[in-house]
Amino acid sequence: MSTIITIPRSVSWKGDAIAVLNQTKLPHVTEYKTLTNIEDVWKSIIMLEVRGAPAIGIVAAFGLALAAKKYDAINIYEFQKKFNRDCNYLGTSRPTAVNLFWAIDRMRESIREITTIKEAQKILEEEALHIQQEDEMVCRSIGEHALTCFKDGDKILTICNAGSIATARYGTALAPFYIGKEKGVRLHAYACETRPVLQGGRLTTWELKQADIDVTLITDNTAAHAIRTKEINAIIVGADRIVENGDTANKIGTLNLAILAKYFGIPFYVAAPLSTFDTTKQTGAEIVIEERDETEVTKIFGKQVAPLGTPVFNPAFDVTPHELITGIITEKGILRGDYKQEITSLFEK
């Protein structure tokens, strides 16, 4: 019987290099790309070869550990200067996913008091491995909590890919499908194709099929009709940043689904680890939304489909107001109701 173990890992540490599952080649080619320096890591994030907020944080952590091994520094002060430069450099790759900055800050903090280069290099490698290992445990816990929201046979709509290949393992929004299969609770996924890069059509369908989980692909425009005619029971999505009041940035089109859930009276869940929360921002209006290249919209797999010179608005994310969210599922449990109070309480513990 197929399980999540059949799904390739998104990021693997090789000691002197990083292997990333090249998600731009999926579903037709399963290819690992070798990253050997910090510039490779930056490009891999920008080009969406590695994607998903937790996976971006993981590859950034490994990227910093890798870079630190190669510094030509004569003392710890010069080492720290080079390290901080690379931290700032990686932070310019993708602005919306807060896990990137969380991982960078965690790596930076891990060597703040270290006095020798050799020890700093050792600690950075260990910390990056811990970040990856912790994410796998966290995602499994998210899946356990999320599964309590569903019952055997439920049809659940999702968008983008918040699955195993977007994390260390299991995923966030897709975690209950994997945990459910382990426990004999069969859930059926309806995956929005997720234009313009088709993360749902290319990635979510691919990884769920790898694990022998029922999945039906729909166009983004079909969501309302599918909810009505296919008796969708709930919607679950991942997140790239959740702020203090519960407002959530996620893949463009998520807000559409939240509005549809409200209209049709079905639950709308967000699944995310605590590392995706940004308590420095009070509302979603403060979130910087990444805008990507116009060719993602004007071309499909390299073929021009729109008239040349057509203006394009191509935000990668939108923000769903907290009042449209039924529950935020974390590794610590499910938040419901007064998100600001619950989130504040979580981070005070």
From Swiss-Prot:
Chain positions recorded as substrate binding sites: 51-53, 94, 199, 250-251
Gene Ontology molecular function: S-methyl-5-thioribose-1-phosphate isomerase activity
Pfam families referenced in this protein's UniProt entry, alphabetically: IF-2B
Site (Transition state stabilizer): 160
Associated pathway: Amino-acid biosynthesis; L-methionine biosynthesis via salvage pathway; L-methionine from S-methyl-5-thio-alpha-D-ribose 1-phosphate: step 1/6
Keywords, in A-Z order: Amino-acid biosynthesis, Isomerase, Methionine biosynthesis
Residues at the catalytic site: 240 (proton donor)
Entry keyword Isomerase: yes
Keyword Isomerase: yes
Domain of life: Bacteria
First-level EC class: isomerase
Catalytic activity: 5-(methylsulfanyl)-alpha-D-ribose 1-phosphate = 5-(methylsulfanyl)-D-ribulose 1-phosphate
Family label: Belongs to the EIF-2B alpha/beta/delta subunits family. MtnA subfamily.
HAMAP family xref list: Salvage_MtnA (MF_01678)
PANTHER family recorded: METHYLTHIORIBOSE-1-PHOSPHATE ISOMERASE
Function text: Catalyzes the interconversion of methylthioribose-1-phosphate (MTR-1-P) into methylthioribulose-1-phosphate (MTRu-1-P).
Descriptive protein name: Methylthioribose-1-phosphate isomerase
Species assigned in the record: Bacillus mycoides (strain KBAB4) (Bacillus weihenstephanensis)
Chain's gene name: mtnA
